[in-house]
Regions:
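Conserved, well-structured interaction surfaces
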Residues: 44, 49-53, 57-62, 84-172, ...
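Acidic, serine/threonine/proline-rich low-complexity intrinsically disordered regions
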Residues: 181-182, 193-196, 247, 260-288, ...
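C-terminal substrate/ligand-recognition segments
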Residues: 105, 408-529
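An aromatic- and glycine-enriched ligand-binding surface/loop that stacks and positions planar moieties
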Residues: 24-89, 175, 200, 239-243, ...
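Bacterial N-terminal signal peptides that target proteins for export
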Residues: 2-10
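Short coil/turn linking the two alpha-helices of tandem helical-hairpin repeats
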Residues: 169-170, 176, 218, 255-264, ...
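C-terminal motif of bacterial Sec signal peptides marking the signal peptidase cleavage site
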Residues: 20-22
Length: 598
């Protein structure tokens, strides 16, 4: 087959990535005054449990694939190419033209709506109304209400306040800190915008308080993917736990130590989007936070990189690497998720996993979605090229065995995570009538009948109606059931153990002197991730991470490892910003791969 490296000129350069525009007071415009119902709510434990449950709504909004034209932040981060009528915000982000007039307000509204609701709960808690339920409530649901349950409620409230505030800080920098106040329609509101440092400290303090109450109430650990419903009174799967609070704290402090904000900026005299100076101690603070998580986990074995189990029932399933299964629902073996967003698997739910499959699965494999015409989110060549060879060396490295001579050969012997993340020409996907078959994305001389390994290009090939525009389809998170009428439940994983190891690797590496060898600790964390990814061990179990690698090269390796391991998980956009590498990796058009069959 003849190859052609194609350019997609309509994906505009993203080197101008900026913070979201300034704020509004929409969150204060409350149409209903709920104060009249407080006495009834806080005398009934079932209603209070419902209040706490409600705090979890929209926890995954910034991660959602429904955001910005069905591609979320993956589009401006150059991970996916979007197609649809709702691309304006994604284009503003990609072009660096976000301003007060065109900025989206979901981060602002979601944060302050939840913050206000949590403050109402906290105020009632602090006034003793929640504790009074212990002796007066005749409607205790499920099991007996205890002091530990009430403290569990409070721990969750602290965690979710930190969660929404941390997301807000990523978008805006310093924010107005309303703390525990609850404003009404008649209140005069004059809360100044706090500095970046003050905002980070407040979020970190919320994490510390969350850990205190969650540990104290017996919820230091909660498996992330066992029970999609969860329960305030019973099982706590899918809810906040102490370890999730530690993980969130580590993430917040990683961002706070990064070059975007850990620096002196002449354009930020009020320190709204930076600290105003560089301090290496911020890297140490972030390292200490993530190390606390790792040490606690090492002592208790709560979390691990999902080792995975091969499913050899079909050729397609046996072809998938372990990495693919880290994102599928597995109530027994998946100990990797730390915090998840649980979505319905009902067919009519527009935010569910079925809709996710409809947006990203190839036409030949989505018969039940044939009339939706929603296909979008096509991986870019830039993302595909980031995946190294199976020996761990980059495809442009002289030590690798990368070939660019045939449409299928260029994907052979690559990092196994590639085929778990992206479907390319020659990739296995399950197919209705044949159980499994190769997927074809080529153009040119089409095979229309016969061998199913060759005929899918009629529907899936580049330039076909409603088909890929880059030559690739997304595979990560997608249930590959060949269009069968099944709706398998899958969580959206918001934090997982691999991210913890990547934070530890990055912070440890930044603590050594410039020009020095990368610390052994950083190398070991990356090797752990690559071992699970089924990268070849190579000489002395190095997994492509050599002993003599310097700090600066290790930094680039970690950046690429995050790009690969965390693809489509709402990290790349923020990573590119915090590392200040947008000019290097995002400027210029995106690319795809055109394969012509002759």
């Amino acid at each position: 087959m003849r190859l052609k490296y194609i350019t997609k000129f309509f994906l505009v350069a993203a080197c101008g990535l900026v913070t979201f525009a300034a704020c509004s007071d929409e969150y204060l415009d409350k149409k209903v005054d709920v104060s009249e119902t407080q006495e009834k709510v806080y005398s009934d434990s079932a209603k209070v449990a419902g209040v706490v449950n409600g705090f979890y709504g929209q926890i995954g909004y910034s991660h959602s694939y429904k955001r910005f034209g069905q591609c979320g932040l993956d589009f401006p981060a150059k991970e996916l190419e979007a197609r649809g009528a709702e691309l304006s915000m994604g284009m503003y982000l990609a072009q660096g033209t976000v301003n007060v007039n065109n900025a989206g307000n979901d981060a602002w509204n979601n944060t302050y709506n939840k913050w206000r609701a949590i403050n109402i709960f906290m105020n009632n808690y602090n006034e003793g109304k929640v504790a009074a339920i212990l002796s007066s409530d005749p409607n205790k649901p499920g099991e007996t209400l205890t002091k530990a349950t009430i403290e569990y409620w409070k721990g969750q409230a602290f965690f979710l306040r930190a969660w929404f505030i941390a997301t807000m800080i990523k978008h805006y920098g310093g924010i107005p800190l309303i703390e525990d106040r609850v404003y009404t329609e008649n209140d005069k509101i004059d809360v100044p915008r706090s500095t970046y440092g003050e905002s980070v400290k407040y979020a970190v303090d919320q994490c510390d308080s969350a850990f205190y109450y969650l540990e104290r109430s017996g919820h230091i650990y909660s498996q992330g993917t066992v029970n999609p419903v969860g329960s305030i009174h019973g099982k706590s799967e899918g809810r906040a736990c102490g370890m999730a609070a530690l993980a969130l704290k580590a993430r917040i402090l990683l961002y706070a130590a990064s070059p975007l904000v850990n620096c002196k900026r002449e354009d930020d005299p009020n320190l709204l989007v930076s600290y105003g100076d560089y301090d290496a101690a911020r890297w140490k603070t972030a390292y200490d936070a993530v190390k606390r998580f790792i040490d606690l986990n090492n002592a208790n074995s709560w979390y691990e990189l999902r080792p995975g189990q091969k499913d050899n029932t079909t050729a397609a399933k046996s072809w998938w690497p372990r990495f693919y299964y880290a994102f599928m629902h597995d109530a027994v073996t998946n100990k990797e998720p730390i915090f998840c967003d649980f979505l319905s698997n009902e067919q009519g739910d527009s935010q569910n996993r079925v809709a996710l499959d409809a947006y990203y699965s190839p036409n030949s494999r989505i018969s039940r979605f044939a009339n939706l015409n929603k296909l979008t989110g096509f991986p870019t060549q830039e993302l595909v090229d980031a995946f190294p060879m199976a020996d761990g060396f980059p495809i442009r490295d002289s030590r690798s065995k990368y070939t660019y001579e045939d449409g299928d050969d260029m994907y052979l012997n690559r990092d196994p995570r590639l085929k778990a993340t992206v479907s390319y020409n020659g990739a296995y996907r399950m197919m209705n009538a044949y159980k499994d078959a190769l997927m074809r994305t080529y153009t040119g001389d089409m095979v229309t009948t016969g061998n199913p390994d060759e005929t899918s290009a009629i529907k899936d090939g580049i330039y076909q109606p409603n088909a890929t525009t880059t030559g690739y389809y997304r595979m990560k998170f997608i249930l590959d059931n060949g269009g069968l009428e099944t709706y398998d439940y899958r969580p959206t994983i918001l934090m997982r153990y691999a991210e913890i190891l990547l934070i530890a690797a990055e912070t440890a590496n930044e603590l050594v002197a410039d020009g020095a060898l990368a610390p052994e600790e950083s190398k070991e964390y990356i090797r752990m991730i690559r071992q699970r990814a089924e990268i070849e061990e190579g000489e002395s179990n190095k997994y492509g991470v050599m002993d003599d690698i310097k700090k600066e090269d290790m930094r680039k390796l970690i950046q690429t490892e995050r790009q690969i391991e965390l693809a489509f998980e709402e990290h790349r956009y923020w990573d590119v910003r915090r590392w200040k590498i947008a000019k290097e990796v995002l400027c210029g058009p995106s690319h795809g791969m055109e394969i012509t069959r002759r």
